[in-house]
A protein has these predicted regions:
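Short S/T/G/P-rich N-terminal loop/turn motif that feeds into the first structured element of a domain
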Residues: 12-243
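Bacterial Sec-dependent N-terminal signal peptides
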Residues: 1-16
Length: 243
């Protein structure tokens, strides 16, 4: 079973240069149900308050498919889009739960720490992307964690690919590319780029969607940018549970 929890706020826009934090989370198998219920029932209202108060643009939580966890070490990915320093999280939780005491809010906030651990965080800078229908969240999202071989050349290749994918690759409902920030990207073992492929069905996700692109278009694109610019380290599959 491949599922995803997703709290999304469709009036928000991700723009070039926005910071998106990917929080890779590990939840033990016997705690998954409790963890996901906690996130929906308690963190969900706080996330909505954070968006309405301008704390961030968007927040999503996805469950990773079991067959994508091999060598990954995480079971969920939380996605924090364009988080701002103000208002404080204390103020956000007060807005979400105005009728609860500070102690009660603190208990709710701390409960999550008993249910999961953060494997690592990756701050990324949004480069480019599209959604065919901004009012609909595609059911399937595949995260490709990539190590670039020629960093700047690969970024330019993906930026140019965005319009090609949007025009010709009708099998995808959306696509995004981001670059990872921080010194960790200099490590040989670390990924430094991520692309996200979005689909409305698993049938489409399991097809070679790029085969829809005319050969002459891809040939011209490859001649301009070259090939063998990246290595996909992990291909992380997720699907939609709650929206």
């Amino acid at each position: 079973l491949i599922l995803c929890i997703s709290f999304t706020f469709l009036n928000s826009q991700v723009e070039e240069g926005n910071t998106v934090r990917l929080q890779f989370i590990k939840v033990e198998e016997d705690k998954v149900e409790e963890f996901e219920s906690y996130m929906i029932e308690y963190v969900g209202p706080a996330a909505k308050a954070a968006v309405s108060e301008g704390k961030m643009e968007n927040w999503l939580l996805r469950r990773v498919a079991k067959n994508s966890r091999y060598n990954a070490g995480f079971s969920h990915i939380a996605i924090w889009v364009a988080t701002n320093p103000e208002p404080s999280w204390t103020q956000v939780w007060e807005k979400a739960y105005p009728n609860l005491s500070a102690d009660a809010r603190s208990w709710i906030y701390g409960k999550g720490e008993e249910l999961y651990s953060t494997v690592y965080n990756a701050n990324c800078e949004y480069i480019a992307g599209f959604l065919r229908d901004p009012s609909t969240i595609p059911n399937i999202a595949i995260f490709n964690l990539i190590k670039s071989k020629k960093y700047n050349a690969y970024i330019e290749q993906e930026k140019d690919a965005k319009d090609i994918f949007e025009k010709h690759a009708k099998g995808i409902e959306g696509w995004h590319v981001m670059k990872r920030k921080g010194m960790v990207v200099n490590s040989e073992g670390a990924w430094d780029m991520v692309t996200i492929d979005l689909f409305d069905t698993w049938e489409k996700a399991n097809q070679n969607w790029w085969s829809e692109i005319p050969r002459n278009v891809m040939k011209k694109h490859n001649e301009k940018h070259g090939s063998d610019l990246r290595e996909i380290r992990h291909r992380v599959m997720t699907g939609l549970l709650f929206d």
